Amino acid sequence: GAGTSGRLGIVDASECPPTYGVPHGMVIGLIAGGDSAIRKAVEFAEDDPTQAWKDLTEHDASAKDIVIGIAASGTTPYVIGGLKECQQNGVTTGCITCNPNAPISAVSDFPIEIVVGPEFVTGSTRMKAGTAQKLTLNMITTSVMVKLGRVRGNRMVDMQLSNDKLV
């Protein structure tokens, strides 16, 4: 993703290893503009339709993976370009967008369109759209971890005990 959407993908991915005991790198979040864009906007990085595939190949994306593009508007060139390349290379794709019939949905095997309506502050997607995307990401990773056997009943069975509160 780019901007808020990319940051949310990174947050969700970073929570999987300590919560479910999966290896770092099993769930990866990428943001247009690279890691420096996590804390400070890298202007125009989202406009490059070729960079996402370059970023994905650095992580050895293959037909064994699923790549989920996150774009509130559903029009971000970085995300759409990455999903197109994934499909051309046999990688299963999904997307999370907040606009119906968005261009990103056309390049996704499994599109998720969450219609939240206009933001209170026009042009900002970190409010309703961002909240809806975060909830959806949590549902996806939780369901995957349940299917992978990382949850029994309602308990995380491979959680990494990393502080006194958890021990």
Please tell me what each predicted stretch does.
Residues A2-L135, V144-L148:
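Glycine-rich phosphate-binding loops that contact phosphosugars or nucleotide phosphates
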Residues G1-A2, S162:
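Proteins with a high burden of low-complexity, intrinsically disordered sequence enriched in S/T/G/P/A and R
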Residues N138, T142-V167:
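Internal, active-site/partner-interface "lid" segment
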